[in-house]
A protein has these predicted regions:
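Structural signal for hydrophobic packing residues in well-ordered secondary-structure cores
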Residues: 38, 110, 154-157
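Alpha/beta enzyme core
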Residues: 6-83, 102-108
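C-terminal helical cap(s) of enzyme catalytic domains, especially alpha/beta-barrels
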Residues: 123-160
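Glycine-rich phosphate-binding active-site loops on the catalytic face of alpha/beta enzymes
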Residues: 48-50, 111-128, 143
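Catalytic cores of alpha/beta
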Residues: 94-111, 125
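Conserved active-site and cofactor/substrate-binding residues in soluble primary-metabolism enzymes
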Residues: 25, 29, 70, 94-101, ...
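Active-site beta-loop-alpha junctions enriched in small/polar residues
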Residues: 3-9, 46-51, 89-96, 120-123
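Structural preference for beta-strand elements that scaffold enzyme active sites
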Residues: 1, 40-45, 86-89, 113-117
Length: 160
């Protein structure tokens, strides 16, 4: 499994808004490049071609959105429609509902998505319980809410 790294760096000659607008192009390039046979990559672990806080209808921190749901569907199709190497989406610490929405969007875009790799998006809401409550409450959260979240994500991939 191979994960190309893409992130905004303030040292680059690019402001954050411009980076966000170019991110789909970067993701498309990374996926296409590392799908080449010469790299012999079996699975690509890649992020969504848009940031969660930039999509209308997704939870954000008061930032203004630059993409509609339909824009994101088109972007997803453009980036991955001719996929040749299996790929999974990583959560990159997205809020759970945003990751779920992004995964649903990917599934509805009819791209050849293999699956997902998700960590923080599933359990990050349990940190306060871990820090401010007790072990039993934390384990209860993981066993109930955490498992429910994994099931929801899996259902997106298995439901047609």
């Amino acid at each position: 499994m191979f994960e190309p790294l893409l992130y905004f760096d303030e040292r680059a000659n690019l402001d954050y808004q411009s980076y966000l607008l170019k991110k789909p192009t970067y993701i498309k390039y990374l996926y296409k490049e590392f799908s080449k046979e010469e790299y012999q990559i079996d699975i690509i672990k890649i992020e969504f071609p848009f940031n969660e806080d930039q999509v209308n209808g997704f939870e954000n921190d008061g930032t203004s959105s630059i993409y509609s749901y339909d824009n994101c569907s088109e972007i997803m199709t453009e980036c991955f429609e001719n996929s040749t190497t299996p790929f999974v989406f990583l959560s990159a610490g997205m809020k759970f509902n945003n990751f779920l929405n992004s995964l649903e969007l990917a599934k509805s875009s009819k791209i050849n998505l293999l699956g997902f790799l998700c960590g923080r998006s599933i359990w990050q809401d349990s940190i306060d319980i871990f820090c401010q409550s007790n072990h039993d409450n934390f384990m209860d959260w993981l066993n109930l809410k955490g498992r429910q979240r994994v099931k929801k994500l899996k259902n997106v991939l298995t439901d047609t």
